Amino acid sequence: MTTRLFISVLRIGAACAIGLASLCATADDAIGLRTRYTDLREQLDHNIFQRAIYIDSTQVGENLKGDVYAVLDYPFSRVTSALKSPENWCDILILPFNTKYCRAANGEGGANLQVRIGRKFDQPVQDAYLLQFAFRGVAATPEYFESRLAAKEGPLGTRDYHIAISAVPLDEKRTFMHLSYAYGYGMTGKMAMQIYLATVGADKVGFSVTGKDANGQPIYMGGVRGAVERTAMRYYLAIDAYLDALNAPHAQQLDRRIQTWFNATEQYPRQLREMDKPAYVAMKRNEVERQQTASQ
């Protein structure tokens, strides 16, 4: 047992002993995530992705979930400060190709994010699908952080969207993070996904490896699980790009986020390549400017 994990065990015992149920649960979650890190050390340290990540997915009935576990080369304080803000989440979510707009606001039920999802190319905001995410900060302690986004309805009969982030500090410079992206679908969503997988998504694959071919090359997850892994990976890369850009002067951070996110996706062309860099950069600059103008 590591020293930090041992300290966490002592803290959970103290919290539970004095009846602090919420702290008890939070400490329990922290221990669970640290245990997951220990279990995944081999995969995190030795993989084909050129970074310390582990990606998996599940499908249960009409529900899909993609999971990314990653070691972030940033202090825990930077990660938690960035991910506890709904406004920062909009700066993160706007980076993937098909996000057209994001606006953080406060409603009767708390903070929410109005996100427009559409084509991977330039598109008017009003033509993109609206997802209304409720934002909830679950935990923020020196040993554990968790926040969640949830949307009841999505485009084309999809539903129950969830983006969840949890993190624990590994040392003064590194953080272990778990990102999960999940949604459910009905008949309309199933048909739309089948059309996508038979056309523009036919050659796409995911990131988890299901075996090796006759030449010893990895066989990657395909189908709907491959698709949900790609989306989860895009969001992870967006978080990493946002955290990296904090090293730059404020006026340069937007362009650095855009450049960093695209360059990262190009490391995985079979999974994530959608357009050339000049087209992506121009599109995102326009979308962010449009987003900033609309929020004024």
Features from the language model and the residues they span:
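N-terminal signal peptide c-region/cleavage motif recognized by signal peptidases
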Residues: 22-26
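Terminal "cap-and-tail" regions of soluble proteins that handle hydrophobic small molecules
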Residues: 28-49, 53-54, 69, 152-154, ...
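Envelope-exposed proteins and targeting segments
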Residues: 51, 64-68, 78, 111, ...
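A short, structured loop/turn motif at beta-sheet edges
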Residues: 73, 106-109, 135-144, 166-176, ...
